[in-house]
Amino acid sequence: MDCRLLNEKSRIFVNADPYFVSDYVNQHVGSHCIRLPKSGCPEASLNHSTFGSLDLCRISYGGSVRVTSPGLETCYHLQVLLKGHCLWRGYGLEHYFSPGELLLINPDDRADLTYSEDCEKFIVKLPSVVLDRACSESYWHKPSEGIRFTTRHNLQQLDGFINLLGLVCDEAEHTNSMPRVQEYYTGIIATKLLEMLSSNVSRETFSEGCPSFERVVQFIEDNLKQSISLERLAELALMSPRSLYTLFEKHAGTTPKNYIRNRKLECIRARLSDPNANVRSVTEMALDYGFFHTGRFAENYRSTFGELPSDTLRRRKMKWLDPEESLPPLP
């Protein structure tokens, strides 16, 4: 498959021990285990870049490697086959993915994948809160069990999507990319996935309650650093607190309290990732957004984004180091 997704600016490993690459992927992209062939010495390569809430990864293990994962928990994986093939096993079925196909792994899906020796993939890690937000902003209905996509997709049927991924990669490797641009592109990717891929989301917009919900959401956005009471939101929506819960369940698939917390966490992550933002400490940032129990804040952050806030801040600082100094040592 001929496409340009991440270049040498994002290179982390070249001709490296697959276990070194796997350890790095476990930290940044998703929890998994690998099993190498008994013979031969595969050499793995990895390009990786962050872009707002997204992690972008181009990976090859250089051998017939089996990759298993019990589940991603808080994120989705979009895996685009670039070279070779990849055997997927799940739900009693098997399928050989080839270049031009897209494998989508839901947060609670078990993964069992076997790479061919020449297999190369491009992977996008997308937090579930980003998709939830795109769903609520479009006034679509998210099922209570969460958003789930079908597994197999053909990129030829997803008009312009590979070009969108290319634009995101170019922007991610641009050192002066602005957080607002990152959030804009991230939202487009999430909305495009909901529009183009088969899922359990009902895309019928709800005619009743939308003005009230939009008014409440805008108030939340304008007051994220303030204490927001459910009574105030119910007053804005011109309804009872009980009806407010129903409104949020219908349009956001969650409770008002969880919605507010997730928006605060998303804003904090954006600030921690922004090289131009003045961030003195994670604790100060948490307190600024009303998280007074820092231990609970860190746990909420990790359960939402798959990493601690200190990890996000540390990765931002790494980008400003000399490129050779910021790379992990090769084996």
UniProtKB/Swiss-Prot annotation:
Keyword Iron: no
Name of one Pfam family that matches: HTH_18
The protein, known as: XylDLEGF operon transcriptional activator 3
DNA-binding region(s), chain positions: 231-252, 282-305
GO CC field: cytoplasm
PANTHER family cross-referenced by the UniProt entry: ARAC SUBFAMILY (PTHR46796:SF6), HTH-TYPE TRANSCRIPTIONAL ACTIVATOR RHAS-RELATED (PTHR46796)
Described function: Regulatory protein of the TOL plasmid xyl operons. XylS activates the xylXYZLTEGFJQKIH operon required for the degradation of toluene, m-xylene and p-xylene.
A biological-process GO annotation: catabolic process
Example of a GO MF term: DNA-binding transcription factor activity
Compartment annotation: Cytoplasm
Top-level taxonomy: Bacteria, Pseudomonadati, Pseudomonadota, Gammaproteobacteria, Pseudomonadales
Start and end residues of each HTH araC/xylS-type domain: 214-315
Alphabetically ordered keywords of this record: Activator, Aromatic hydrocarbons catabolism, Cytoplasm, DNA-binding, Plasmid, Transcription, Transcription regulation
SUPFAM superfamilies: Homeodomain-like
